[in-house]
């Protein structure tokens, strides 16, 4: 076996294994949490857009969704070990969310730059306070959701690792 090749669990009772439907449910829950984060932020700042509240909220959330899904997948947030015990739920969620918050802010700033002037992207347009608030908010919201899912899955399926 090649030591650099990732090990894919072959049996359902491996601690790394998650059924496909559960990956889908957790990913969907993550996306809903991030859309809720964007909706709360837009409401707090009374942001409106010509595309309407739903499309505007999804457009605001999209960079954060991409950042979270990529980092959570890369850091093991969608494996069986990401949901038990609670210390591991917290560790894997916070590890990815602390990186996804700043990356989401950066992606959002890049997306909002005029497409013809992307070369003129300026770092000084990103407020450090927004990075901090977004990162903490995303981390807390995702942690609450993932801890709730972790507890629910253990109640429904006690045989899970």
Task: Enumerate the predicted regions with their spans.
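Juxtamembrane/disordered regions of integral membrane proteins
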Residues: 2-161
């Amino acid at each position: 076996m090649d030591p650099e090749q990732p090990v894919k669990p072959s049996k359902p009772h491996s601690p790394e294994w998650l059924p496909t439907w559960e990956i889908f449910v957790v990913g969907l829950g993550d996306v809903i949490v991030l859309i809720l984060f964007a909706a709360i932020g837009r409401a707090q700042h009374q942001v409106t857009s010509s595309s309407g509240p739903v499309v505007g909220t999804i457009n605001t959330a999209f960079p954060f969704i991409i950042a979270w899904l990529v980092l959570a997948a890369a850091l093991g947030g969608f494996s069986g070990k990401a949901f038990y015990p609670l210390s591991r739920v917290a560790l894997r969620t916070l590890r990815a969310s602390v990186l996804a918050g700043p990356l989401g802010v950066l992606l959002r700033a890049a997306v909002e730059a005029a497409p013809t002037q992307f070369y003129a992207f300026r770092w000084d347009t990103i407020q450090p306070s927004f990075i901090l608030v977004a990162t903490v908010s995303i981390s807390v919201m995702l942690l609450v959701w993932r801890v709730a899912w972790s507890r629910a899955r253990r109640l429904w399926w006690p045989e899970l690792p």
